[in-house]
A protein has these predicted regions:
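Bacterial N-terminal signal peptides
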Residues: 15-28
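Non-catalytic cap/lid and distal C-terminal segments of serine-dependent acyl enzymes
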Residues: 35-321
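N-terminal secretory signal peptides that target proteins for export/translocation
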Residues: 1-11
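Hydrophobic alpha-helical membrane-insertion segments
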Residues: 5, 31-32
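Intrinsic-disorder/low-complexity regions
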Residues: 12-15, 54
C-alpha cells in the first residue's frame, strides 16, 4: 500500500486530538441518574401574587376615619398579661346611634398601613360607599406576660399569643365580652346586637375569632377566618367534630385558606389546609351560613388581605347601611 509522505503523521495527530476532545466532552456529561435529577429539578413555579384593590388603599374622595391608640390594657381574666389595642372610628360615626363592631386579632398587623390587611383603609372605603354599616374597629394584640409591653416587639407576636388564641374554651371570649367591649363602650356607642358584631383574624387569630363566636353566639355572630389554625396546636383539630356533634349555632362565617398552607402529609392534624377543608365540610353539613375561598398561596395574609373588602361586604350583606 502506498502512502503520501507526512499524511500518516498528520492523521495520527488528528486522531489523538479527537480522542482528547471526546474524553473532555464525556467528563462534563453527567451520568443518566444525574441527568434525570436535573430534569426533575425544574425552577419552582412563581408564587401567585395577590394585589390589593383600590378598596384597600386610601382614596382622595373617601373621608378618613380616626385610628386612636395604641392603648395599654391589663386583663383581670387573662391574668398577668398586658396588651395594646387600637380603636378605629369612622368619619360617619354618630354617637346617637349604636355602631356595629369589628374586633380583629393581631391588631398590630391588622392596622399596619404598609401591611397586606390594612383594615382601617377597607373600613373607610366600604363605609363611605355604603357597602357595610358604620362600624367601630377594635384591634387587639395578643397578651404579653409581665407588667410591660416591650416596644421592641413591633409587629411580632407577644409571648402569650398561642395560649390565648389556640386554646379552646371561653377565657378569651370572656375577655372580649366582659372587658374589651365595656372598655371601648365607655367612649363609643357600640351595638349590643350580636348580628352587628363581627370578629376576625388570621392564622391562630382566626381560630381564636371562631372560638369567641362558638362560645358566645349571643354576643358575636359574624366570623372572618383567614388561614385559620384549626390544627392540633392546642386541640383545635377537634372543631370539625364538635361542629357536627352540636346543634347549629347562629353564626355566619367566611373561611379563606391556601392550597399550600403548611402542608403536613405525615400528620394531617397539623396540616393547615386539610384541617380547613374538614372545617368547611363540617360547616356545610350543618348548613351554616358559610362562604369560603381556597387560593393558591401558603400560610400568608396576602390572599386574605386582597379579598378582605369582599369578605366584609358578604359578612354585612343584609345589615342596614
Amino acid at each position: 500500500v502506498s502512502t503520501v509522505p507526512g499524511l500518516t503523521k498528520r492523521f495520527s495527530i488528528l486522531q489523538i486530538a479527537l480522542f482528547v476532545l471526546t474524553l473532555s466532552a464525556l467528563a462534563v456529561i453527567p451520568p443518566k441518574s444525574r441527568c434525570y435529577a436535573q430534569e426533575a429539578a425544574k425552577p419552582a413555579a412563581p408564587k401567585p401574587k395577590y394585589r390589593l384593590s383600590s378598596d384597600s388603599l386610601p382614596q382622595e374622595e373617601t373621608p378618613k376615619g380616626k385610628l386612636e391608640g395604641p392603648f395599654l390594657f391589663k386583663s383581670k381574666i387573662l391574668v398577668g398579661t398586658v396588651r395594646k389595642y387600637w380603636v378605629y372610628v369612622p368619619a360617619q360615626y354618630d354617637a346617637s346611634k349604636p355602631a356595629c363592631v369589628l374586633v380583629f386579632q393581631d391588631g398590630q398587623r391588622a392596622t399596619n398601613p404598609n401591611g397586606v390587611l390594612r383594615v382601617p383603609n377597607v373600613l373607610d372605603n366600604l363605609i363611605f360607599k355604603r357597602q357595610m354599616p358604620v362600624t367601630i374597629g377594635i384591634f387587639i394584640t395578643p397578651g404579653q406576660l409581665g407588667e410591660e409591653y416591650p416596644e421592641t416587639l413591633g409587629f411580632s407576636n407577644p409571648n402569650n399569643r398561642s395560649v390565648e388564641y389556640d386554646s379552646l374554651g371561653d377565657a378569651y371570649a370572656r375577655f372580649i365580652v366582659e372587658e374589651m367591649l365595656p372598655e371601648v363602650g365607655k367612649t363609643y356607642n357600640l351595638t349590643k346586637d350580636p348580628e352587628g358584631r363581627a370578629i376576625g383574624g388570621a392564622s391562630s387569630g382566626a381560630i381564636c375569632a371562631f372560638t369567641v363566636a362558638w362560645e358566645r353566639p349571643n354576643e358575636f355572630r359574624k366570623v372572618i377566618s383567614l388561614i385559620g389554625s384549626f390544627t392540633d396546636i392546642r386541640g383545635g383539630h377537634v372543631y370539625p367534630e364538635l361542629v357536627r356533634k352540636n346543634k347549629r349555632k347562629p353564626i355566619r362565617i367566611f373561611v379563606e385558606d391556601g392550597f399550600d398552607d403548611n402542608r403536613r402529609p405525615d400528620n394531617l392534624k397539623r396540616d393547615w389546609h386539610i384541617q380547613n377543608q374538614l372545617m368547611v365540610a363540617a360547616l356545610k353539613d350543618k348548613r351554616y351560613d358559610l362562604n369560603y375561598v381556597f387560593g393558591e398561596g401558603g400560610h400568608s395574609d396576602d390572599h386574605g388581605g386582597a379579598i378582605l373588602p369582599d369578605i366584609l361586604r358578604w359578612i354585612f350583606r343584609d345589615f342596614e347601611k
